[in-house]
Amino acid sequence: MKIWIDADAAPRDVKDLVFRASRRLMIEVTLVANRPVPLPPANRLVSAITVREGADVADRFIATHAQPGDVAITADIPLAAQLVAKDVFVVDPRGELLDDRNIGGRLAARDFFDAARGAGMETAGPKPYSQRDRIAFAATLDRILTRAIKRRDASPPNAPPADAPSTLEPPPDSPQDPNA
């Protein structure tokens, strides 16, 4: 399991909270941006990847490399939709969990406002990042990391499928089922 941060627009508070969680839970974090981003000192679990400049280059990198069960932090709704489809846990910087129940509505709203702006309509930008957003993000991140860790620990990466026959022999002194 890994945490991916769409780092071009992620608030510093979000990155700091993720860095602390990384250190506490021993989870790898990768920041992806089209410019160099500062890394926390003395945390080898955190790395950064600088992609070439261009529209959605960082998003495509994250979408390509994130795996089911990973966690991604992004405010980019099209990227979130791609990640949700890959069974990646997605949290926006304001603490909203984006999943298959709400991503369609968020994508439709994003497309509507994008079309309105394209037609010359002025739309309000996002509100400034607040302490309430920080608290909501911290709570959601904690909840999602707990779920992701439970999922990871419940299914080891090299576990055989549930219907595969066991190749393990019972211990010599264990009772054996005569009907087996």
Regions inferred by a protein language model and the residue ranges of each:
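Nuclease catalytic cores that cleave nucleic-acid phosphodiester bonds
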Residues: 1-163, 168-180
